[in-house]
Amino acid sequence: MKYILVTGGVISGIGKGIIASSVGTILKSCGLHVTAIKIDPYINIDAGTFSPYEHGEVFVLDDGGEVDLDLGNYERFLDIRLTKDNNLTTGKIYQSVINKERRGDYLGKTVQVVPHITDAIQEWVMRQAKIPVDDDDVEPQVCVIELGGTVGDIESMPFVEAFRQFQFKVKRENFCNIHVSLVPQPSATGEQKTKPTQNSVRELRGLGLSPDLIMCRCSTPLDNSVKEKISMFCHVEPEQVICVHDVSSIYRVPLLLEDQGVVGYFCRRLNLPIENRPRKMLAKWKEMSDRSDRLLEQCSIALVGKYTKFSDSYASVIKALEHSALAISHKLEVKYVDSADLEPSMLQEEPVKYHEAWQKLCSSDGILVPGGFGVRGTEGKIQAINWARKQKKPFLGVCLGMQLAVCEFARNMLDWTDANSTEFDPETKHPVVIDMPEHNPGQMGGTMRLGKRRTIFKNKSSILRKLYGDVDYVEERHRHRFEVNPELKHHFEEKGFRFVGQDVEGERMEVIEMDDHPYFVGVQYHPEFTSRPIKPSPPYLGLLLAAAGRLQSYLQKGCRLSPRDAYSDRSGSSSPDLEIADLKLRSIAQE
């Protein structure tokens, strides 16, 4: 087993997750089996109770693990499926050690950070690195480990010490360290500054770890003189200083690393068994990146939510939209609409915000209401859903978005004016969305219906069923405490509001569709968590196809061809450039 530790310096949030994912991608393209571990030095057991404003979205895994959004990057880049133990937190380690102490496993010894906490970290990493994450169920050969935060943080000290010991335990030829550092370029001088990187590397060395590769995050490519300066003062060869400058798309980062000889360095440093053969996987990434830069037609989606000021709150949703837009060769424009600004009360309080929000919504090609929690902004989301239904605008509701679509229909089509979710109005006379029996209201963490669950399609004419490939069931990831009230189901279906997907027992409503609407779909699960750059999520793909006016032609062709082949229902034909791009992508996919 080979271990690659990715650490960061100067500031957090400079792209360690993307770099770690990109390293894994180029190694996987060489035929190696790669896994990934993310270490978060916070005391929380998991990310389940985080505010989206605090830490971005909570990513959900197949086993129900609520983890850091970086694990979403690993899964998307590497096309793997991780488990909750691939996200290691200080809370998990301390909980494990304390439980052992309570059981008497330490035989009366004084339990300390060194050696007990550090040993537990090393054991966890070695154990988890062996768990297969690919579909072929083969034990990984390389484990990429990302240490969150920055070197020198008091929270990460036990982990740094653990890896200082770990490098000797597994031997030098099986362990290397990538250090990601910022090279700022002040606008006043325009000169790239190396001092922060020098100080960061010095601090890392003082803690017992020496970087094998220094990856420099910068806005523009590094000058040779700057690279030589970092090489000299940080005691590494010039080839070990890698420039990771800003690029047009994150999908170009693996190509950027490949061009600078990172694979060759790993071959020599870790004695990796890499064959000298064409890398078809990277060829796909290059084609995808090139195509994303050439897109001309644009499609706009209004994302109506309550966390719109912080894009990381909807990281996977945005990625799923990007994957689908790229699949139909359209440039994506996401219009963030704060749902609270759509509420009638805003017309009196802040009319400018109110009109701007409605202008964004009405000028969009499609509307998406993603998941969320809490009552704030829910009435605005219902207003947006009402407009999408009446104006026959393509709509996708995810989790809470589906539940609010049920509320909107009940209020306006069933004349249940007080219809609501018991989450927001426990005393409503028409509880169309109710608390699930297994939900424990006295505890917040880990009390939801989580992880991969099966959804059975009950209707063969379902649009979503066709988009999934005309299958009988799908398995997608869930994260919710409330569900549609099954006792009221028949009232909706009499009015053309169909529950076309249910759980295995037939008790929980999973998918809704509406008759006489080009695309009005709601899903209780979160399809964005399983979307991949080359395999977009079907519900999101359907939204983009409908928004671009291509859904009907795609469905008429049996959903077997690339969606880019579906001519526009609005214009009647596709451009020759798109047809050429389609032909190229299909030839690569067939390889």
UniProtKB/Swiss-Prot annotation:
Active site as annotated: C399 (for gatase activity), H526 (for gatase activity), E528 (for gatase activity)
Pathway(s) per entry: Pyrimidine metabolism; CTP biosynthesis via de novo pathway; CTP from UDP: step 2/2
Pfam family, one: CTP_synth_N
GN (gene name): ctps1
Gene Ontology CC: cytoophidium; cytoplasm
Function as written in the Swiss-Prot or TrEMBL entry: This enzyme is involved in the de novo synthesis of CTP, a precursor of DNA, RNA and phospholipids. Catalyzes the ATP-dependent amination of UTP to CTP with either L-glutamine or ammonia as a source of nitrogen.
Protein name per its UniProtKB record: CTP synthase 1
Family classification: Belongs to the CTP synthase family.
Group of enzyme by EC: ligase
Alphabetized SUPFAM superfamilies for the sequence: Class I glutamine amidotransferase-like (SSF52317), P-loop containing nucleoside triphosphate hydrolases (SSF52540)
Domain of life from the UniProt record: Eukaryota
Keywords: ATP-binding, Glutamine amidotransferase, Ligase, Nucleotide-binding, Phosphoprotein, Pyrimidine biosynthesis
The species this protein was found in: Danio rerio
Residues annotated with Phosphoserine modification: S571, S575
Sequence ranges assigned to domain Glutamine amidotransferase type-1 in this UniProt record: 300-554
Enzyme Commission numbers on file: 6.3.4.2
GO MF, one example: CTP synthase activity
InterPro entries hit by this protein: Class_I_gatase-like, CTP_synthase, CTP_synthase_N, GATASE, GATase1_CTP_Synthase, P-loop_NTPase
Keyword ATP-binding: yes
PROSITE patterns: GATASE_TYPE_1 (PS51273)
GO biological process: 'de novo' CTP biosynthetic process; CTP biosynthetic process; notochord development; pyrimidine nucleobase biosynthetic process
PANTHER family (alphabetical): CTP SYNTHASE (PTHR11550), CTP SYNTHASE-RELATED (PTHR11550:SF0)
Extent of the signal sequence: none
Reactions catalysed: UTP + L-glutamine + ATP + H2O = CTP + L-glutamate + ADP + phosphate + 2 H(+)
Coiled-coil segments: none
